[in-house]
Design a protein with these regions (language model features):
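Post-HExxH zinc-binding segment in Zn-dependent metallohydrolases
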Residues: 101-140
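Hydrophobic (often cysteine-bearing) scaffold residues that line and stabilize catalytic clefts
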Residues: 75, 79, 83, 103, ...
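Active-site recognition of the HExxH zinc-binding catalytic motif
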Residues: 80-93, 112, 116
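Surface-exposed patches in mature extracellular/periplasmic domains of secreted proteins
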Residues: 3-14, 102, 128-129, 187-190
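A structural motif
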Residues: 79-86, 138-149
Length: 217
């Protein structure tokens, strides 16, 4: 359905330290490149990482809601993370692993959306969307707004709140677009329509110009 024809040559289960430092230099212990996929399959580790998004915010009812949500994550979320990484291998994306700064928000948002739809229950999907919006609002209230087009390799130089902020905005943007065009397949078709244009404006601005998005999140 999503044209995932090729798969990583290796799927490596690793503890948090190995996944983050020894194998990929990544602050998030799940990633894919053109050879392998690496992931820490420990739910407790992921609960801890997601909780770290909240470290710089003062206690509030919203923060308590978010903390309770992440403490209660099910093993479906581990499957969703695996699905997220495998969905990167879809041939429907136009860029390869070397082009990480080229409209990467779209690919990251799509693989997050697809994997959540596939592995999470309807209730879990809705709760993730709700919590993502809370986190985006908290981040923007504290740090201000910037365009999603800045999502790129430099994103990973920040703390967990700033890293996941870009992922959650990407997901929420894709969620709006899918609702507008009707399906994931229709959104891929729209994406390919932009690719066949002169690409004089970014994909994100093109969605706004085509009135598929009212404005950036």
């Amino acid at each position: 359905e999503y044209q995932v024809r090729d798969l990583p040559q290796a799927l490596i289960w690793a503890n948090e330290e190995a996944a983050r430092k020894l194998l990929g230099q990544s602050p998030v212990p799940a990633y894919t490149n053109d050879i392998r996929m690496v992931m820490t399959p420990d739910l407790a580790v992921w609960k801890k990482i997601y909780q770290h998004q909240l470290d710089s915010y003062e206690d509030s009812p919203d923060l308590q809601t978010l903390s309770a949500h992440y403490k209660g994550l099910s093993e479906n979320h581990l499957l969703q993370i695996i699905g997220h990484e495998l969905a990167h291998w879809s041939d429907l994306f136009l860029d390869d692993f070397a082009d990480y700064d080229a409209n990467i928000w779209f690919e990251e948002g799509m693989v997050e959306y697809i994997s959540r739809q596939y592995f999470l229950t309807e209730e879990e999907f809705a709760q993730e969307r709700f919590c993502n919006q809370l986190l985006v609002d908290l981040f923007q209230e504290k740090h201000g707004w910037h365009s999603l087009d800045t999502f790129g390799k430099s994103t990973y130089e920040g703390d967990y709140a700033s890293i996941f902020y870009e992922y959650w905005r990407s997901f929420l943007t894709i969620d709006q677009l899918v609702e507008k065009v009707g399906s994931v397949q229709a959104l891929f078709e729209t994406y390919h329509k932009w690719a066949q244009s002169d690409q004089s404006i970014s994909l994100l601005n093109w969605f706004v110009q085509e009135e598929l998005l009212e404005k950036e999140i």
